[in-house]
């Protein structure tokens, strides 16, 4: 399960004309390459911050989506010299290398038609739901997002009745609301159920290519926290 959520975002207007005029346009040049600021990255004092160039480039292999009235276009982020400043670029490179090596192996088995092998991933996301009032009483949860003290966990599978057990109405309402929010973003869930520990649950999406799956998982974690807040819950990832 993926636990960490970290993503970057820059918002540009597509109404560039001044003087009170509006002309909606979005050029291909802006889509192919943008120029946000990369001065926040550590450089060891080797360059002035205003000279820290970072470029975004459109990633057409992942799906665009609309969130909060903005068209979100997945991009890669690299330096002026082409070095990766994100985690998407190494992922795309690794997918290309896996495809290249897999096609090479297929050739050894006599397959002469396959040109590319696509990596498919369906990253399940496990999470805990805690009531806000109880969450506020636990300093370890508020500071660290996880428990640092408490009762010892049972080691004899005494809690086997929770796994695949009936989902509580409050949690079921949360899951239903989460599904609807994810559908708006083009993320389809395949499975949802209780997990082994108390208040632990799981959501598994439909398999898609690894690049899009990673992008969608970031959206899943973001929406899990937002939807939980509406239901008086706190989502721990």
Language-model-derived ranges and their functions:
Residues 1-12:
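Single conserved hydrophobic/aromatic residue that forms the stacking wall/gate
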Residues 11-237:
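Glycine-rich, acidic/polar active-site loops that bind/position phosphate-bearing ligands
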């Amino acid at each position: 399960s993926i636990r960490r959520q970290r993503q970057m975002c820059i918002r540009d207007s597509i109404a560039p004309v001044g003087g009170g005029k509006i002309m909606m346009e979005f050029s291909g040049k802006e889509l192919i390459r943008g120029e946000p600021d990369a001065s926040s990255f550590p450089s060891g004092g080797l360059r002035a911050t205003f000279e820290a160039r970072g470029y975004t480039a459109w990633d057409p292999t992942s799906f665009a989506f609309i969130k909060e009235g903005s068209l979100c276009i997945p991009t890669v982020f690299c330096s002026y010299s082409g070095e990766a400043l994100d985690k998407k670029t190494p992922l795309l490179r690794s997918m290309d290398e896996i495809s290249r090596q897999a096609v090479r192996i297929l050739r050894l088995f006599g397959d002469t038609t396959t040109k590319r092998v696509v990596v498919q991933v369906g990253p399940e996301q496990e999470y805990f739901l805690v009531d806000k009032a109880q969450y506020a009483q636990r300093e370890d949860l508020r500071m660290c997002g996880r428990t640092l003290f408490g009762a010892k966990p049972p080691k004899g599978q005494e809690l086997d009745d929770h796994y695949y057990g009936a989902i509580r109405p409050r949690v079921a309402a949360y899951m239903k609301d989460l599904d609807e929010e994810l559908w708006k973003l083009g993320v389809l869930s395949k499975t949802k159920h209780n997990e082994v520990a108390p208040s632990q649950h799981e959501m598994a999406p439909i398999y898609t290519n690894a690049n899009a799956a990673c992008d969608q998982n970031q959206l899943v974690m973001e929406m899990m926290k937002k939807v939980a807040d509406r239901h008086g819950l706190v989502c721990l990832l």
